[in-house]
Amino acid sequence: MEEVVVPRHGDHHNINIKYGFFIFALTIIQTIFFLQVKFIQIKRWNSTGRFSKFWSQITNPPIWLMVTVWLLIVIFTGGHKISDFSEEYIISAKRYGRMAYCLIPLNIYLVLRPTNSPLLKPGYYLENMSLHKWTSRIIVFCSTIHAAGYVYKWIKEGAILNKPFRFLNLLGVVVFVFLVVLAIISIRPFRRKVYSTFYLIHNVTAWSMVILITFHARPGVTVFAVISLILLGYQLYLRYYSSYMVNSLKVIDIPTSTLQIIKIPQSNKFPNWLPGSHIRLNYTISKFKSWTTASHPFTVVTIPEDSTNNLTLIVRKPNSFVINPLDSYLVTGPYPSLAPPFFTTANIVNIICGGSGISLGLPIYHHFKSINSTVPVKLVWTIRNQNDTFIMNQLDMTGVQVYVTSIGDTNSEQQENQQQAVPLFVIEEEEEEQGHGLLNNDNENGIELQNMPKTNEESSEANSTNSKNNKDNQERKEYFKFGRPKFDEVFAIDDPTTTYDLDNSWVIACGPDELISDAKRWSKDRGYRFYYEKYEM
């Protein structure tokens, strides 16, 4: 027989409903606020012709500040009007459970990816990823307090072997177990090693929490459940039904390189995109993998002005995303990285990229060279494997400064052994022994830009042209240097007498943490604006 809660707790049964609506109202206010300030930031940037650091900081406040504010809110709300915690702890425990559920719509919203939305905050969904991770942790925090309160209560009552297994209670136990497993596997080292498992557990947990807690929660949470389901449905729509189907993908590489060039036929309906934008590639809806694995983001190297029929990508060699030229795939996007006013207001642009990070720098470089040639723009690309320079034969890299940082035999295995010993960058006149060893984990840093293996047919083609590529490799040596670039040298202003508006002077970095850190420090020392992307999961 089910426990009758109302007579036992009186009006305490419904006392927490208002706190759930309070938390949900705050999430709505936050969402509207950031939508508005992002829109204002871009409009003001367009109208004034100057980047505003103030509006940028309002649009993207420090993550520690956002997390601290939310933690203070949930802690204060969880203990509000609790006069005797030893007697009323269960009221607080229930409240934390309700607050956790009322944060779910915000957490889903933060990972929505509307395409081609350069004026909207969600259009730059990568900006929301850190907040999504920390909101998830706050949900786990609230859920843990909720669970701990009930475990304590059941132990006191001597019902710990009974009540957790009542059907409605068991639904909550199941969801909490999922949350604990997700919290553990989402720790960065685990997540990187078993990302596909993490992704599957993440989705199962999200759907389970939305659906099962609808029945578990007493009083009900129907309003929040409906909103969450609508958002999840919209997420599926964006992933599958607003996508473009493509086939006949082409892979270009050489066996000794760590990079590949991927060419994707461009759909006639695919919209124009800003330089540096990325797409996401997924299996078709009929494939089981499309439901159990994440879609894969890739930065588009080509720009609309190239007038090609392909979307060209530069990616690292494959590990999990297998491309079959006979299969069809879904492409979603484009998703902008830099806001539109950047391309019309920048008056000096310095770009530093490591490894596959060239995929961000090259289209921005090409844009200014071909569309806005009055803007001084420089691009530095650092690689460890000399054979990666084969892409210089496939793409226009005129004027790009290329540095090979692994010195010695070009054999990829030997270069791999040398990687840990070669520091890559010198900022001003730092001691060599203080080098930061950048790019030591190039494939581990940045948004999850997974790479794709070549097919047997493409492998055969690559082998047949390997000798030609080796010859080309020797010819390319005159276009790149060995060693470490110095920022002050590679980004030296051509005309020292020229002064630039620092609000519109930029440094852009794409690569691993150390590269980004050094570029940011150099940029800050000179008062430049700074933008970066790091490729990781």
Curated annotation (Swiss-Prot):
SUPFAM superfamilies documented for this protein: Ferredoxin reductase-like, C-terminal NADP-linked domain (SSF52343)
Species of provenance: Candida dubliniensis (strain CD36 / ATCC MYA-646 / CBS 7987 / NCPF 3949 / NRRL Y-17841) (Yeast)
CDD domains attached to this UniProt entry: NOX_Duox_like_FAD_NADP
Topology relative to the membrane: Multi-pass membrane protein
Annotated InterPro entries: FAD-bd_8 (IPR013112), Fe3_Rdtase_TM_dom (IPR013130), Fe_red_NAD-bd_6 (IPR013121), FNR_nucleotide-bd (IPR039261), RBOH/FRE (IPR050369)
Enzyme Commission number: 1.16.1.-
Keywords, ordered alphabetically: Electron transport, FAD, Flavoprotein, Ion transport, Membrane, NADP, Oxidoreductase, Transmembrane, Transmembrane helix, Transport
Compartments where located: Membrane
Domain Ferric oxidoreductase intervals: 97-213
Pfam families documented for this protein: FAD_binding_8, Ferric_reduct, NAD_binding_6
Membrane-spanning parts: 20-40, 58-78, 95-112, 133-155, 167-187, 194-216, 221-238
GO terms under biological process: reductive iron assimilation
Domain of life: Eukaryota
Domain FAD-binding FR-type, chain residue ranges per copy: 187-363
Chain spans, region Disordered: 432-475
Gene Ontology MF, one: ferric-chelate reductase activity
Descriptive protein name: Probable metalloreductase AIM14
Annotated family: Belongs to the ferric reductase (FRE) family. AIM14 subfamily.
Biological role stated in the UniProt entry: Probable cell surface metalloreductase. May be involved in iron or copper homeostasis.
GO cellular component: plasma membrane
